[in-house]
Amino acid sequence: MEYTKLAQLYQILEETTSRIKMTQALVDLFKETPPELIDKVVYLSIGRIAPEYTGLDYNFSEKSAIKALSTVLNISEHDIQHQVLQTGDLGDAGKKLYEEKGVKPEGILTVEEVYRTLREIAQTTGYGSTKKKLQLFTELLKKASPLEVKYLLRTITERLRLGIGDNTIMDALSIAFTGKKENREIIERAYNISSDLGYVARILAEKGLDAVKNIKIEIGRPIRPMLAERMAIPSYILKKLGGKAGAEYKYDGERIQVHRKGDTFYLFSRRLENITDQFPDLIEFLKESIPEECIIELEAVVIDPSSGAIRPFQDLMNRRVKYVTRFHIMMYPIAGFIFDIMYLNGEDLTLKPYPERRKILEENIKITERINLSERKIVDNVEDLESFFHQAIEDGCEGLVCKSLQKDSIYQAGKRGFLWIKYKRDYKSHLADTLDLVVVGAFYGKGARTGYFGSLLMACYDPETDQFKTVCKVGTGFKEDDFKKLDDLLKEHTLDHKHPRVNSILSADIWYEPFLVLEITGAELTLSPVHTCGWDRIKINRGLGLRFPRFTGRYRFDKRPEDATTEEEIINMYKNQIQIKS
């Protein structure tokens, strides 16, 4: 299969903002793709060569890409950089220079060759790796047409930006290989328990939908985490959960999924990054506490060894370094609070109700000084729920997660729902909780902020449309060093136009690819004529905006943009807020 077909698809995707047209373009390509290549096409179309949990990245800088381009075109790197400044994008610059120079490809690029070469680049490490990576990529460019060059450059520098998410790809796979969108749910279940969309696509293309239904949980493949909805009124929480709930402490730490098979451990973050090397001490503690073959979830916190008190979340962030040393282990001692189990000795437990899973935990976890079960209480009245909430706050927690005890209280991998409800009340405002919002744009600063942004345009996520919808412009709560930090984080994700997945009425001075999640608080949610979250849902020609938004100082690197607060959550928060006021 020629790579030019992928490049042509990418151009179509880039030029449309219609999800229907994007889906159809993907359907057409998937139907043309040989089954043995479908996984590679899926990976390449999301800008990767393997699922995120493998940690396989290109580690290929823009500077290296320019050097490769310079070699092929026989022009100076300075001339290329000048063209990049003019076009605002390395891919566009490369395409234009190829066309101007009349470069003739030295061969025909295939999907197989592109994938194989990019994978080799990602796997090349150690002494001399920079030179070898450069040689490999240069050979690809020699065989590329101008359009192919554009997308190869964007791919290798991890800036493909096609505006498609997992949901759009799953819709297209369902239509292409089963003839209808309704089978997407089966594909999504397989993806949620394997976290590998390319793998699911290949099983579907080669063996059909029944084989996808038979995809099982495996040690080493992370399960996409179950997510909680949020409510602020205890009586409503209990009513929503059937009058009775299992209330658990919501620890202010890092959610970690632990896989164990014998002495082999895998630790995955909330966004499915492999963080095994960052917690060698936690693994030693877990060896004493958890079964030989299992998948469990826990909240890791930093504690004060003398008192056992939980230290602030910021202390835990000091453990998120590439190389953990004895210093980190001594200064930031870890404890783990286990709150769920999804797999035990070959058995998938995700379809068992929560009370059964909790009982299995209690029977199989050995409590030690550093490993414990999450603090829990069964509550069936508001007074007990309120009392337990205050106890959690006093013990240094964020609040509670209230869990359904009903028969349908399965572990909903990759889904957000009311089987789990967060209760994190903020007494200083009407806002029931902080919001985790995605940076999608910025507005220029003035005075002391000249040269930096004045405010950031923040958005929630709508999984139904696979779009990011604006909620507020935030310009307060930032410390002096935040401006430099955010500038460094955002500059490589700058766009010269609004991202196709961003739904915004406002015109930002700078647009960004949605990737960075920040924790935002505020006074209350109000009807807004300029923000698109909840547009027409509460009132015609009005959305929902956050009044007096403020950055809490917390960067949510543990969350993907698709893990941000959803539109539906914000609508529910607004309704709860109205009820509290009344």
UniProtKB/Swiss-Prot annotation:
<dbReference type="GO" id="GO:0051301">
    <property type="term" value="P:cell division"/>
</dbReference>
<keyword id="KW-0132">Cell division</keyword>
<feature type="binding site">
    <location>
        <position position="270"/>
    </location>
    <ligand>
        <name>ATP</name>
    </ligand>
</feature>
<comment type="function">
    <text>DNA ligase that seals nicks in double-stranded DNA during DNA replication, DNA recombination and DNA repair.</text>
</comment>
<dbReference type="Pfam" id="PF01068">
    <property type="entry name" value="DNA_ligase_A_M"/>
</dbReference>
<keyword id="KW-0227">DNA damage</keyword>
<comment type="similarity">
    <text>Belongs to the ATP-dependent DNA ligase family.</text>
</comment>
<dbReference type="InterPro" id="IPR012340">
    <property type="entry name" value="NA-bd_OB-fold"/>
</dbReference>
<dbReference type="InterPro" id="IPR022865">
    <property type="entry name" value="DNA_ligae_ATP-dep_bac/arc"/>
</dbReference>
<dbReference type="GO" id="GO:0003910">
    <property type="term" value="F:DNA ligase (ATP) activity"/>
</dbReference>
<keyword id="KW-0547">Nucleotide-binding</keyword>
<dbReference type="GO" id="GO:0003677">
    <property type="term" value="F:DNA binding"/>
</dbReference>
<keyword id="KW-0131">Cell cycle</keyword>
<dbReference type="GO" id="GO:0006281">
    <property type="term" value="P:DNA repair"/>
</dbReference>
<dbReference type="GO" id="GO:0006310">
    <property type="term" value="P:DNA recombination"/>
</dbReference>
<feature type="binding site">
    <location>
        <position position="299"/>
    </location>
    <ligand>
        <name>ATP</name>
    </ligand>
</feature>
<keyword id="KW-0436">Ligase</keyword>
<dbReference type="InterPro" id="IPR016059">
    <property type="entry name" value="DNA_ligase_ATP-dep_CS"/>
</dbReference>
<dbReference type="InterPro" id="IPR012309">
    <property type="entry name" value="DNA_ligase_ATP-dep_C"/>
</dbReference>
<dbReference type="GO" id="GO:0071897">
    <property type="term" value="P:DNA biosynthetic process"/>
</dbReference>
<feature type="binding site">
    <location>
        <position position="255"/>
    </location>
    <ligand>
        <name>ATP</name>
    </ligand>
</feature>
<dbReference type="InterPro" id="IPR036599">
    <property type="entry name" value="DNA_ligase_N_sf"/>
</dbReference>
<feature type="binding site">
    <location>
        <position position="339"/>
    </location>
    <ligand>
        <name>ATP</name>
    </ligand>
</feature>
<dbReference type="InterPro" id="IPR012310">
    <property type="entry name" value="DNA_ligase_ATP-dep_cent"/>
</dbReference>
<dbReference type="InterPro" id="IPR050191">
    <property type="entry name" value="ATP-dep_DNA_ligase"/>
</dbReference>
<dbReference type="Pfam" id="PF04675">
    <property type="entry name" value="DNA_ligase_A_N"/>
</dbReference>
<dbReference type="GO" id="GO:0006273">
    <property type="term" value="P:lagging strand elongation"/>
</dbReference>
<keyword id="KW-0235">DNA replication</keyword>
<feature type="binding site">
    <location>
        <position position="422"/>
    </location>
    <ligand>
        <name>ATP</name>
    </ligand>
</feature>
<dbReference type="Pfam" id="PF04679">
    <property type="entry name" value="DNA_ligase_A_C"/>
</dbReference>
<dbReference type="InterPro" id="IPR000977">
    <property type="entry name" value="DNA_ligase_ATP-dep"/>
</dbReference>
<keyword id="KW-0234">DNA repair</keyword>
<dbReference type="GO" id="GO:0046872">
    <property type="term" value="F:metal ion binding"/>
</dbReference>
<keyword id="KW-0233">DNA recombination</keyword>
<dbReference type="GO" id="GO:0005524">
    <property type="term" value="F:ATP binding"/>
</dbReference>
<keyword id="KW-0479">Metal-binding</keyword>
<keyword id="KW-0460">Magnesium</keyword>
<dbReference type="InterPro" id="IPR012308">
    <property type="entry name" value="DNA_ligase_ATP-dep_N"/>
</dbReference>
<protein>
    <recommendedName>
        <fullName>Probable DNA ligase</fullName>
        <ecNumber>6.5.1.1</ecNumber>
    </recommendedName>
</protein>
<feature type="binding site">
    <location>
        <position position="248"/>
    </location>
    <ligand>
        <name>ATP</name>
    </ligand>
</feature>
<keyword id="KW-0067">ATP-binding</keyword>
<feature type="binding site">
    <location>
        <position position="416"/>
    </location>
    <ligand>
        <name>ATP</name>
    </ligand>
</feature>
